[in-house]
């Protein structure tokens, strides 16, 4: 994990979940059903419902996601839903160097 914090900006590695792994339709940590096609995220400690702007550091693409789950349970710092990750990086790559900031 490379998670670093600079003046409210956190950087690290993002991965995705919800496609082909059995999570789509399952309950998230806040009790709602996980939808791989909504822009959501799993984070270990940000408050549920927080909205964060995630920026891919390689291409500048951004997505705003809502934290609705806990995790990640991999080597990453942030787990994005399949759709949110696909908006900022090819899912074939599997991970991305990102920075994020709470916006709401």
Mark where each language-model region is.
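Secreted/periplasmic proteins
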Residues: 2-104
């Amino acid at each position: 994990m490379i998670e670093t914090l600079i003046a409210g900006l956190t950087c690290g590695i993002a991965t995705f979940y919800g496609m082909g792994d059995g999570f789509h339709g399952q309950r998230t940590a806040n009790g709602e059903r996980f939808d791989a096609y909504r822009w959501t995220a799993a984070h270990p400690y940000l408050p549920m419902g927080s909205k964060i702007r995630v920026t891919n550091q390689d291409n500048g693409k951004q997505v705003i996601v809502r934290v609705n789950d806990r995790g990640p349970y991999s080597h990453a710092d942030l787990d994005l839903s399949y759709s949110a990750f696909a908006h900022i990086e090819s899912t074939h790559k599997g991970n991305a160097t990102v920075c994020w900031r709470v916006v709401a």
